[in-house]
Amino acid sequence: MKGGRDLKAARGGADRPLAPAYAPCRPGRLQRHLLSGEFDQLRDFPIFESNFVQVTRFGEVANKVTMGVAASSPALELPDLLLLAGPDKENGHLQLLGLFPLQFVQLFVHDESRQQLKVKFRTGRAFYLQLRSPPETRDCEFGRWVRLLYRLRFHSPTCAVPFTHEDTAPEEEEEEEEEEEEEEVKEGQLQPPEFQATEARLDPQVSELWGL
């Protein structure tokens, strides 16, 4: 994170006592999809997921996205993987579009008032996601993402900070935007070239998981 600023307290309870990142609950769409048998090695991963709509930097809606974070081992205290899924264009069924090590991704709180997150790869490619959930649970659900953000920010054992607030200085943001390429969340565009040796785009028809 550039600028080294302290994270601001965010709406949704980021300053509350930390709860377990993966509270037991009814599996979401992504979890149920993984339980369907397509991806046997992901069946038992603890996953925290939400439904979003992808929006442009200016708030225009692009498409629907389900995003989740998962721990690749029960021994891990915090998640180390990011999963992205979306509806199949032909039948509308959920398909897994990509799985990425969190060390290669940054997740920002882009706009708290609109419950928007920003996902950015090290290549500079980025996209914006706005939480899509019932109004009566939206604040609580976004608050869980913020609390997870804080856990990852302050409990990370490495120097990498995968989750943080997007509160860089104006001149730094201008420089960042010049390097940033806004990304559309769809299959075929979710694999930053420099990570091809260490991560794999997951074809929903194939059960190969790059060694997990």
From Swiss-Prot:
Record's keyword terms, sorted: Golgi apparatus
Region annotation (Disordered) ranges: 1-21, 162-212
InterPro entries: GARIL-like_Rab2B-bd (IPR022168)
Broad class of the protein's primary localization: Golgi
Cell location: Golgi apparatus
A family per Pfam: GARIL_Rab2_bd
CC per GO annotation: Golgi apparatus; sperm head
Segments of skewed composition (Acidic residues): 169-185
Single GO BP term: spermatid development
UniProt keyword Electron transport present: no
Expressed in which tissues: Expressed in testis (at protein level).
Entry function: RAB2B effector protein which promotes cytosolic DNA-induced innate immune responses. Regulates IFN responses against DNA viruses by regulating the CGAS-STING signaling axis.
Family: Belongs to the GARIN family.
Assembly notes: Interacts (via N-terminus) with RAB2B (in GTP-bound form).
Name of the protein this chain belongs to: Golgi-associated RAB2 interactor protein 5A
Organism: Mus musculus
Gene name for this UniProt entry: Garin5a
